Structure formats: structure tokens, C-alpha cells
């Protein structure tokens, strides 16, 4: 080892001693003041110091000034003879060849020193915080002091020597390179180097593109395979639906098939069969609707027409649609009265009685068995109560049988005609009175009765009683019906 190399190694060892002292002692003391774990806090301190020197210019200048003072004390050189610029030149010249160190300006040397120190500090901090070194620095410091400091000094010296060799090689390559004579050649050389870098990037991108295309082709093959499998399964499902098309449960499945994308059904037969199924369904729906309409019309015709056996007399009752504000009064007749009247008429027709004979017989009967006679009797004798009337009706004998009515109709004499005419005059008088009483009653309109059934129409027979006639069919379609008769 010559004298020059020994001088360089002494400078590198001085640099290593200063920064090892900072990492081993100064940052460890700062970590002890925190309440967190010492290991974690020591790591935070090391990282903070490295980032501060790199990023904060003031902290870097402060660190460099303290290092300058330390260097003067260690080398025992007076600060007057070794100023700050000479200190920077001494450190940087130890990394560069002599032929180049004299030609470099002081500003460039400052920038070179900054790069060297920042790189050195970051690498030394990374080495200290490894799992191999960190436990020995934080724990059992007295026992492991010599061992740890020796390893740190060896790492520092080897790193600085390696860095010196790299800088030497850079300057040697620069010396071998022939400098361009003109600016045009210099720009050409710069652009050619930039072009080479672009070509290298293009090669990398093309290789990546090839790899991506290969992956895309494999994925496309997988997709086509799965798509064909999916189409096959859908076709099988469609065939199964066609086999069970006669059952009603197949209808939701056909709807499910129709919701699937059309690209899976390239078969034209499926499209034709699907359209035919839709036509059949629409035809069935139309037929059902026509049947319903025919049933409704038939029911309306049945309810609107009366039986042919029962002639309907002309009624004085006018049934119109009621206004929205008018309350509908209750009817004077009920379903029971209507059924009783129908049963009576059927019984008379079965036994051979005509309506004319029944009317004449009702005119010739004794007035004591009529409702009008009971009313006149009650008017003449108001002291007789309803109980006596009920007893009188219960005690009366069934003297008028159907056989007696037949014999009476056959054997009746012409002298009864005068009494019949008198009774007709009485009936005409009563009809006039009833017409005057019913003129003030409102005509009720009910829209619910027009389409379903016609109301009961009451007329007076020749004997002065109400005779019930109806346009009802034999089927009763409603409950109580509310009407007003004028």
C-alpha cells in the first residue's frame, strides 16, 4: 500500500467514525426519551435523520459544518490553515483521479460531496437497522460494543472504497470518449443515444404485447368453449320443453327461454315453433273471451225476458235511473211474496183454472174473508183490537175448496153480473184515490236493475186487490231491492 492510498483510507475512516458516532450514540439517546418501545423508536430516529439530510437543505448544511469541525479536531489541523472550501476539496479529491480533480470547479465539488454523503448515510442507516445489527445496538450495548462498532467501521470503509472505484471508472470512460468537435455532432450524439433508449423501450413493449395477445387468445378459446357448452345446454332444455308441451307446466319454461339472448338460438326452427306457440296461445285467449261474452249476453237475455206462460199486464210503474243524491227507499215487495205469487199461478195453471174464472170467483166471494172487509170492520168498530182480528182469521172455516170453486164456476148463474158491475165501479173509485195519493212520490232510478232484472209491477185486479206479476226468470239473482211505485 503506497502513501496515497493510506491517506485516502485515513480520510474514509474519519468519515465513518463521525457518522457511526451519530447513529450509535446520538440517535440512541434520542430514542430513550420516548415512551414507545426503544427498538421502534430507534428505527424512527434513523429514518428521520436520513430523510432530513436528504430533503432539508439547512439540516444538511448544519451536519456538514459539524463534520468540518470534527475533521479538524481529529486531524489536528488548524481551521485557519484548512478552511471550509479546502475541506470540501480534500474529501472530494480522495474519490477522484488527480488529473480531473484540478479541472473541476468548487461548485461541482460541493454537489459531488452532497451526493456522496447522502448516499453513504442512507446505506449505513439501512445496514444498522437490519435484523442482524439492530438487537446488538439496542440491547446489551456494553457487551457488544467492540463487535458492533468494528462491523460498522468495516461496512463504512468498504462502501466508501467501492464508491471511489465507481467514480474512477466513470471518469476513465469519459476520458476514452472523444469529445465532439461541433455542436451539431454533440446534438446528434445526444439524439442517437435517446433514440437507442426509445428502441429499447419499444422492444420491451412489443414483448409485453405478445404476452398479452397470447393470454387473450387462451381466454378467447376458453370463452368459445364455454359458450358452445352453454348453447348445447340451452338446446337440451328447449327440447325437453317441446316434449312436455302438452302439459300446462311447460308454459313458464317457454317464457324463460324467450327471455334468453337471441344469439344462443340461431336455429330457425325454434323461432318458427315459438311464433306458432304464441299464435295458439293468443287464439285460445280470444276463444275464451268470446265464450265469456256469449255467456253474459245469454244471462242478460234470460233475466230480461219473462216466461211465456205468464202474461205481463201493463203497469203504471216507471223505473228510471236514480240520481246520485237520492237515497233509494225500500221495496214494498220481497222475494218471499214473489215466490208465493209464482207458486199460486203455477198451481192454478196445473189444476186448470183460468185467470178470468179466478177473478170472477174473487168478486163473488163473501166480503168477510177479504182484507178490505177487515179494514172496513176496523173502521166502523175502533174498539175491536188486532187480537180479535187474528182470532177471527184463525176461526174461519176453509169452506172454499178448489173443488167447490170448480163447481161454482160451472153452476154460476147470470144474476151475479150486476154485483160484478157494482164491484167494478168501487174498484175504479179506489184506483182514482190511489193515483192521487201516489202522484207526490218520486220516481226512483236504479242503474243496477236495468241489466239484471226488472222490478215487480203491481196492478189492481177487478176485485180491488193488488195482483202480482213479474218479469223475473225463475232464478233469483239478488237480495232485497228498493223501489218506489207511482
Swiss-Prot record:
<feature type="transmembrane region" description="Helical">
    <location>
        <begin position="7"/>
        <end position="28"/>
    </location>
</feature>
<keyword id="KW-0325">Glycoprotein</keyword>
<keyword id="KW-0426">Late protein</keyword>
<feature type="glycosylation site" description="N-linked (GlcNAc...) asparagine; by host">
    <location>
        <position position="195"/>
    </location>
</feature>
<dbReference type="GO" id="GO:0016020">
    <property type="term" value="C:membrane"/>
</dbReference>
<feature type="coiled-coil region">
    <location>
        <begin position="183"/>
        <end position="233"/>
    </location>
</feature>
<keyword id="KW-0472">Membrane</keyword>
<feature type="glycosylation site" description="N-linked (GlcNAc...) asparagine; by host">
    <location>
        <position position="73"/>
    </location>
</feature>
<keyword id="KW-0812">Transmembrane</keyword>
<feature type="glycosylation site" description="N-linked (GlcNAc...) asparagine; by host">
    <location>
        <position position="461"/>
    </location>
</feature>
<comment type="similarity">
    <text>Belongs to the asfivirus B475L family.</text>
</comment>
<feature type="region of interest" description="Disordered">
    <location>
        <begin position="299"/>
        <end position="329"/>
    </location>
</feature>
<keyword id="KW-1043">Host membrane</keyword>
<keyword id="KW-1133">Transmembrane helix</keyword>
<keyword id="KW-0175">Coiled coil</keyword>
<feature type="glycosylation site" description="N-linked (GlcNAc...) asparagine; by host">
    <location>
        <position position="83"/>
    </location>
</feature>
<feature type="compositionally biased region" description="Polar residues">
    <location>
        <begin position="300"/>
        <end position="323"/>
    </location>
</feature>
<dbReference type="GO" id="GO:0033644">
    <property type="term" value="C:host cell membrane"/>
</dbReference>
<protein>
    <recommendedName>
        <fullName>Uncharacterized protein B475L</fullName>
    </recommendedName>
</protein>
Amino acid at each position: 500500500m503506497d502513501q496515497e492510498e493510506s491517506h485516502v483510507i485515513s480520510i474514509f475512516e474519519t468519515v465513518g467514525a463521525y457518522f457511526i458516532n451519530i447513529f450509535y450514540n446520538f440517535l440512541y439517546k434520542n430514542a430513550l426519551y420516548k415512551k414507545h418501545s426503544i427498538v421502534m423508536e430507534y428505527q424512527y430516529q434513523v429514518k428521520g435523520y436520513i430523510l432530513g439530510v436528504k430533503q432539508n437543505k439547512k439540516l444538511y448544511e448544519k451536519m456538514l459544518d459539524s463534520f468540518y469541525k470534527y475533521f479538524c479536531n481529529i486531524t489536528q489541523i488548524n481551521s485557519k490553515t484548512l478552511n471550509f472550501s479546502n475541506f470540501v476539496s480534500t474529501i472530494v479529491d480522495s474519490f477522484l483521479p488527480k488529473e480531473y480533480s484540478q479541472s473541476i470547479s468548487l461548485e461541482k465539488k460541493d454537489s459531488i460531496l452532497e451526493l456522496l454523503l447522502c448516499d453513504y448515510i442512507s446505506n449505513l442507516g439501512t445496514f444498522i437497522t437490519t435484523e442482524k445489527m439492530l438487537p446488538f445496538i439496542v440491547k446489551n450495548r456494553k457487551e457488544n460494543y467492540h463487535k458492533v462498532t468494528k462491523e460498522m467501521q468495516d461496512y463504512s470503509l468498504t462502501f466508501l472504497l467501492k464508491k471511489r472505484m465507481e467514480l474512477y471508472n466513470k471518469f476513465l470512460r469519459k476520458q476514452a470518449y472523444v469529445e465532439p468537435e461541433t455542436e451539431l455532432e454533440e446534438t446528434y450524439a445526444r439524439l442517437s443515444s435517446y433514440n437507442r433508449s426509445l428502441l429499447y423501450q419499444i422492444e420491451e413493449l412489443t414483448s409485453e404485447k405478445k404476452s398479452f395477445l397470447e393470454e387473450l387468445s387462451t381466454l378467447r378459446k376458453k370463452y368459445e368453449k364455454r359458450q358452445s357448452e352453454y348453447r348445447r345446454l340451452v338446446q337440451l332444455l328447449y327440447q325437453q320443453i317441446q316434449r312436455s308441451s302438452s302439459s300446462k307446466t311447460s308454459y313458464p319454461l317457454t317464457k324463460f327461454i324467450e327471455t334468453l339472448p337471441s344469439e344462443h338460438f340461431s336455429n330457425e326452427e325454434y323461432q318458427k315453433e315459438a311464433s306458432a306457440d304464441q299464435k295458439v296461445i293468443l287464439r285460445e285467449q280470444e276463444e275464451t273471451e268470446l265464450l265469456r261474452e256469449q255467456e253474459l249476453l245469454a244471462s242478460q237475455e234470460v233475466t230480461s225476458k219473462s216466461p211465456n206462460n205468464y202474461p205481463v199486464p201493463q203497469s203504471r210503474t216507471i223505473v228510471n235511473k236514480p240520481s246520485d243524491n237520492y237515497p233509494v227507499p225500500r221495496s214494498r215487495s220481497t222475494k218471499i211474496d214473489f215466490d208465493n205469487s209464482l207458486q199460486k199461478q203455477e198451481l192454478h195453471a196445473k189444476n186448470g183454472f183460468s185467470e178470468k174464472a179466478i177473478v170472477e170467483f174473487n168478486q163473488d166471494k163473501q166480503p168477510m174473508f177479504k182484507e178490505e172487509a177487515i179494514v172496513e170492520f176496523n173502521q166502523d168498530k175502533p174498539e175491536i183490537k188486532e187480537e180479535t182480528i187474528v182470532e177471527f182469521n184463525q176461526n174461519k172455516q176453509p169452506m172454499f175448496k178448489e173443488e167447490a170453486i170448480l163447481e161454482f164456476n160451472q153452476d154460476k148463474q147470470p144474476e151475479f153480473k150486476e154485483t160484478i158491475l157494482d164491484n167494478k165501479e168501487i174498484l175504479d173509485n179506489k184506483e182514482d184515490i190511489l193515483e192521487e195519493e201516489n202522484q207526490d212520490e218520486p220516481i226512483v232510478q236504479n242503474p243496477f236493475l236495468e241489466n239484471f232484472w226488472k222490478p215487480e209491477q203491481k196492478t189492481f185486479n177487478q176485485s180491488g186487490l193488488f195482483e202480482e206479476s213479474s218479469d223475473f226468470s225463475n232464478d233469483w239473482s239478488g237480495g232485497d231491492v228498493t223501489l218506489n211505485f207511482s
